Amino acid sequence: TVVEATSGNTGIALAMVCAAKGYPFVATMVETFSVERRKLMKALGAKVILTPAADKATGMVQKAEQLAEKNGWFLARQFESEANPEYHRNTTAAEILRDFAGHGLDYFISGYGTGGTITGVGEVLKVARPNIKIIGTEPSGAALLGGQPWQPHKIQGWTPDFIPKVMNREVIDQVIPVDDVVARDTSLALARE
């Protein structure tokens, strides 16, 4: 059995892989996370265990760790595993560099959940394009990188109540807070275009 704490994105991917390989998969999620993501994981054969909102993302991680320890399950550890940013170094960053070959690339802007994307992509882009600026974004009410206390926010998959171990903060040149309502309204406007 594979177990992982997830806001849904990695959980959906793990549910697909586990279904294809015939492995049982258990996802732990905070009860306030997307019902749609839960349904999709369940449709792929996953068992979804909800943790109390008051326990935040730390609670879902602790629940996954407890289940792995108690049952001898494999814990994927997306917030800690070096495989996470390594994947983005080898694929996401390589794709960006291919797409921008012969063109300027001044900024890479990314939010963070596990920190894998901004770390892996940022590290490669800094070497390939030394003048690039890596911009991290996080909900304004949960601006941990900005030195603020964490508060619940509405941007799914972004910014748990801890700074992930896998994240290389040194690669980030600037952090920009994003308002929940503005983020929602902007995504809806872009979807309509």
Report the location of each language-model feature.
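PLP-dependent amino-acid enzyme catalytic core
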Residues: T1-E193
